[in-house]
Amino acid sequence: MTLSPYLQEVAKRRTFAIISHPDAGKTTITEKVLLFGQAIQTAGTVKGRGSSQHAKSDWMEMEKQRGISITTSVMQFPYHDCLVNLLDTPGHEDFSEDTYRTLTAVDCCLMVIDAAKGVEDRTRKLMEVTRLRDTPILTFMNKLDRDIRDPMELLDEVENELKIGCAPITWPIGCGKLFKGVYHLYKDETYLYQTGKGHTIQEVRIVKGLDNPELDAAVGEDLAQQLRDELELVQGASNEFDHELFLAGEITPVFFGTALGNFGVDHMLDGLVEWAPAPMPRQTDTRTVEAKEEKFTGFVFKIQANMDPKHRDRVAFMRVVSGKYEKGMKMRQVRIGKDVVISDALTFMAGDRSHVEEAYPGDILGLHNHGTIQIGDTFTQGEMMKFTGIPNFAPELFRRIRLKDPLKQKQLLKGLVQLSEEGAVQVFRPIANNDLIVGAVGVLQFDVVVARLKSEYNVEAIYESVNVATARWVECTDAKKFEEFKRKNEVQLALDGGDNLTYIAPTMVNLNLTQERYPDVQFRKTREH
């Protein structure tokens, strides 16, 4: 049975994000993946701090200075018979809810682990988020050109700490200066590594079969024997790859390689296009939407300000869930119940924009936004429904923002509200005074906010500590009790960027006592957009 042209396009799409701890090599992998997708001809090396060859996916000013990826960029490239959408997420020490929300827009994730260090803190946090939706995970053990931990130990650690079975697809031969290549367990082939080929796609020498004398000649008898011994162990002790279990998020195929040396990345990409799911169905508040439906639907998972310093604009990123986008089509923005014509949607190659004529499920569109689109907005061709599961998290860190020039209060508020709509930070306006408090998931966000207020809104601000330990969104079905709660706790109440009532607690003890005192009031840690 031949599929209709529309369904063929849907079946070709793969949408994934990379999750990792800072410095595990995520940006380098992104580069190499794009190199294989022929999207960039020579891969820009990330770190040379002053070098002009910046990695292609880190494009905001502050990222260029610090060598880290702060904003989620989107890149589309062809690979084999598929069209792959890669959503790049911030990888540095400190990241924002952007990262969490980006994971709601993908169908699959690649987990990158520094094989010298194993599972690290940020990887754990991000894996918890993918678990909420049982997202399928592929794993790349990176940095084999350095000395690494024992590969079996690494697999055990992933299984025990992240509660997901490991099915090795390739297996390393040596590491560090002795790294010779990898053996593919399912193809019975050894791929030999050559150094110094990191910037290009190399012709790899392949040796067929484990008992081939060529293997001993190529890697040395000791390493060849070690490989055979290890493989006996591996085949006895580890999981076989099982596609059903992979799609259920219970087992992860594991690849070994070095992104810097551009080796092993293609094996992982082959696995991605072969095994990762085509665009998946999504829940709304009324029904499940399937990718094969012909009517257009999509949701906004991120807003990015000023992608183009020349045009002080903001762009809303929308994941297409079903149907085909065509230039100039009419869509309904469900939250405000208004029909809009979208004639100038964008696709991205990190920072380079091109206008798009059509897009399919799994693709990410950029919509020009003049303040009317919010995170979590659903667009349809008229049906009134809302996609669910796009979270807002209660921040864990708080600072008061203070102006150096008090006359700029209006610009400051405008800047903070726009940054909060974008999800870069959350802003709270206490009811009892004129303070402006910002809340974030990580410390670096405060620096980002101050830098962006200055460069984009021309506002000089500083942040200082404030007596807030945590925040909760509050609501109550009993209006009378809610009024009493508001009257007695006015000092602790604030409005967030979307004018939702929030309780800002000076200590956790205060929060617990208040919750006990007002059992009818709900204190929420997350809020649906």
Swiss-Prot record:
One of its GO terms (molecular function) is GTP binding. It holds the Pfam family RF3_C. Keywords: Cytoplasm, GTP-binding, Nucleotide-binding, Protein biosynthesis. The gene is prfC. GO terms for biological process: regulation of translational termination. It is found in: Cytoplasm. GO terms for cellular component: cytosol. Gene3D superfamilies: P-loop containing nucleotide triphosphate hydrolases, Peptide chain release factor 3, domain III. Belongs to the TRAFAC class translation factor GTPase superfamily. Classic translation factor GTPase family. PrfC subfamily. The keyword ATP-binding does not apply. GTP binds at residues 20-27, 88-92, 142-145. InterPro entries: EF-G-like_DII, EFG_III/V, G_TR_CS, P-loop_NTPase, PrfC, RF3_C, RF3_dom_3_sf, RF3_GTP-bd. SUPFAM superfamilies: EF-G C-terminal domain-like (SSF54980), P-loop containing nucleoside triphosphate hydrolases (SSF52540), Translation proteins (SSF50447). Residues 11-280 form the tr-type G domain. This is Peptide chain release factor 3. It comes from Citrobacter koseri (strain ATCC BAA-895 / CDC 4225-83 / SGSC4696). Increases the formation of ribosomal termination complexes and stimulates activities of RF-1 and RF-2. It binds guanine nucleotides and has strong preference for UGA stop codons. It may interact directly with the ribosome. The stimulation of RF-1 and RF-2 is significantly reduced by GTP and GDP, but not by GMP.
